Amino acid sequence: MVTNSEDPKRTAYTLSVDANSPLTTTGISAHDRALTCRTLAAPNAAPEDLRRPGHIFPLRAREGGVRERGGHTEAAVEFCRLAGKRPVAVIAEMVVDGEEVAGQAMRTEPGMMRRDGCLAFGKQWGLKVCTIEALVKYVETRESKLHVNGNGSA
């Protein structure tokens, strides 16, 4: 795990990895990334099954799930847990290109798609979308609230 993460969202990054397999080439292709994700998710995965550095950045969810930290990582693992599956998930960011700048090879405000953009995308394409806030509310309705002490730990 990254010992001194300066991430303002407190995302628990680990070391980047690729699958240590004869089927892995550079690690960057969709095939290689999918193989790495399957390797990471395998119940019997061992450190020697992975090589470092790589192109996949594993994240660790907090033990208290979305009740402890309302992040994408915890939400993905929470959905797995609620479905009765192993607490292993793959997440990806949706991105926006921004608007073209006339006469220039650049765009304004490209970056990660935010909440409202994701909700609009889901509506446009008929996809089910759930906000982290709604997931927290659902979990707290079904289970007890997680009590956090004054220093931010459970």
Listing of model-derived features with the role each one plays in the protein:
Residues 1-154:
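Catalytic domains of riboflavin
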